[in-house]
Amino acid sequence: MTSRPLILGSSSIWRKQVLIDMGYIFKTMSPDIDEKAIRDSDPKTLTLLISRAKAQALLKRIKESDDELDKKSIMICSDQVIVHNGVIREKPETEQQCREYLQSYEFHPAVAVVSVVVVNIETGKIVEGTDIATQHFKKISDEFIDKLIKQGDVMHCAGGFTVEHMADFTLQLEGEVETILGLPKTLTKNLISQVSQ
């Protein structure tokens, strides 16, 4: 744990839940950057670049604000992509694309690549890292895919799926479920510890 206030640089309900489950008290701020303007063919590099951009956008906003507590905080920003059979997948752009994503996971697993950038705003210390987890699925029925898409959450998730809604179709998980959710628990805890010293 840290004695400094925490800021989660994300509006993701899944990242929020990971931090809550870890026992942290924090506030959230949305970076509001154009992630599509940042491109790289390597998933680790891409997620690091986007995480850094999120952190820089929020740092600028915090430094220009009058909130002294924010200026003494530790900020966490992360980004996630899913790699499927060597191809990077971000959030689906259409329902059809989401449907194709979900139908494909029975053939190749979903590999979550998540980068995290943690900043001690007061000292300026920045640390970062990347974690990977692989989720294997069995065939997901068309009826269930329709239900997921209608419900809507999957349209806001890298790779077009949410593990909490798909328990009946999940097989082996290699790595942390928190990585699949978008915020690796062990990595995040270690990075917070590093900037707290």
Curated annotation (Swiss-Prot):
It is found in: Cytoplasm. Its EC number is 3.6.1.-. The keyword NAD does not apply. It catalyses: N(7)-methyl-GTP + H2O = N(7)-methyl-GMP + diphosphate + H(+). Belongs to the Maf family. YceF subfamily. PANTHER family: 7-METHYL-GTP PYROPHOSPHATASE (PTHR43213:SF4), BIFUNCTIONAL DTTP/UTP PYROPHOSPHATASE/METHYLTRANSFERASE PROTEIN-RELATED (PTHR43213). The keyword Hydrolase applies. Nucleoside triphosphate pyrophosphatase that hydrolyzes 7-methyl-GTP (m(7)GTP). May have a dual role in cell division arrest and in preventing the incorporation of modified nucleotides into cellular nucleic acids. InterPro entries: ITPase-like_fam, Maf-like. The active site is at residue 79. This is 7-methyl-GTP pyrophosphatase. One of its GO terms (cellular component) is cytoplasm. Its main location: cytoplasm. Keywords: Cytoplasm, Hydrolase, Nucleotide metabolism. One of its GO terms (molecular function) is nucleoside triphosphate diphosphatase activity. The record marks 14, 80, 164 as: Important for substrate specificity. GO terms for biological process: nucleotide metabolic process.
